[in-house]
Amino acid sequence: MDVLSLWKILYMWVVFIYDKNDLFFFFCVALFGGSLGTLSIVKALFLVNFKHLTVVTLLQKLQPIFAIILARLLLKEKLKRAYLFWGFLALLGGYFLTFEFNLPEVVEGDNLLAASLYSLLAAFSFGSATVFGKRVLKAASFRTALYVRYLMTTCVMFIIVALTCGFGDFSEATGGNWLIFVIIALTTGSGAILLYYFGLR
């Protein structure tokens, strides 16, 4: 059995087991958490040539703001009164972190503004994926949530890569690159996300 046939079997299993609402939230987790969030944060880091890491990484800390807002809207979870104050303070801190005490402006040759926007998009994507993941765990175990997330993320990323840059760059990756990819997948990838879903139950 080749890899493509295995993916088809897994896909049909997922479609057969879960209803349309569950599949929609699985897709949202894959689209935002697995694809857009990852692409956005990597794009942000490349825009600043891995400098200004403080700005890019600290703006990521705003993702709980988006998660809590969406949890209120989608999951109908109640917000404490103090949330509005701390949420506003976090957004204000994010602004000063990016622009200091200046108004936003685009400086030629400076990618910090674009990188900050990508970082905010990543924060929104990861934050929303937390909410969608919480909804998914009502219908699936944390292990199944991980497997289906990877399955759908692979499908989404396959389409994105096919429609944008193509697959030519795969041939340029060295053995060392693939080893690093595997290490990332097994540690901060699969291992971390499995613990994340375990705690999100």
Model features per residue range: what roles?
Residues 15, 45-49, 98-112, 164-181:
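Membrane-interface helix termini and inter-helical loops of multi-pass transporters
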Residues 1-8, 24, 28, 85-92, ...:
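Hydrophobic alpha-helical transmembrane segments of multi-pass integral membrane proteins
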Residues 42-78:
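Specific alpha-helical transmembrane segments that line the substrate/conduction pathway
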Residues 44, 73-75, 79, 136, ...:
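Hydrophobic/aromatic residues within transmembrane alpha-helices
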Residues 64-124:
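Juxtamembrane helix-loop boundary signature in multi-pass membrane transporters
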Residues 38, 53-62, 132-155, 189-201:
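Helix-helix packing/entry segments at the starts of transmembrane helices
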Residues 10-54, 96, 185-201:
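Specific transmembrane alpha-helical segments of multi-pass solute transporters/efflux pumps
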